[in-house]
Amino acid sequence: MRAGRDERAWIRGAQAGSASDLEALFRSHWPSAWRAAFLVVHDAAAAEDIAQEAFLAAIRNLDRFDRRRPFGPWLHRIVVNRAIDWARARSLRAELELVDAAAPAQPPEVGSDVVGALRRLSPEHRAVIVLRHLLGYTPGEIARLLELPRGTVNSRLRRGLDQLQETLP
């Protein structure tokens, strides 16, 4: 429970302009923010940019953040939305990247076959699968994070899992 109290104190301090509290928030949430972005976009450099942009957006809007709520889900929402936007923009571009030859290191707890299968999903399906099965959010939490109806989240989870089953051995 101490971590929650520390986080609330860091948020209060950051809202008051404390650079050290802002740094503590950043250090605490950077790994999961980067991981969430990476698992959606599958590009280490883009994931870093997305996570940094999400933190900057969070900092700019920290005065509107409700300190009674946990910071992590709020930040993950920003990260995932930006990652989806990036993935959509990338897929709209006609350029095809041969990333497999120079693929970045995968998170150790996710096998390369799973990462490859996730790559084949649409950004929308990939985001809900990552939030649910790799970051541990419930469907209700995902619906709130992404501002989607619960039925849409459930549908994307089911379709995404069905597609993963078809592609995984």
What are the functions of these language-model segments?
Residues R2-A3, G13, H42, V99, ...:
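C-terminal edge and immediately downstream basic/flexible tail or linker adjoining helix-turn-helix-like DNA-binding
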Residues D49-L56, R60, R69-N81, S155:
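Structural recognition of an alpha-helix C-terminal capping motif at a helix-to-coil junction
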Residues F26-A44, N61, L118, T167:
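Amphipathic, Lys/Arg- and hydrophobic-enriched alpha-helical face
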Residues P73, V80, I84, L134, ...:
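DNA-recognition helix of helix-turn-helix
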Residues I11-R35, I59, R126:
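A short, charge-rich alpha-helical start-of-domain segment used by transcription regulators
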Residues V128-R132:
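A short pre-motif secondary-structure segment
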Residues R60-R67, R77-E97:
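Arg/Lys-rich amphipathic alpha helix in sigma70-family domain 2
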Residues A3-E7, D85, S91-L118, T138:
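Internal acidic/polar
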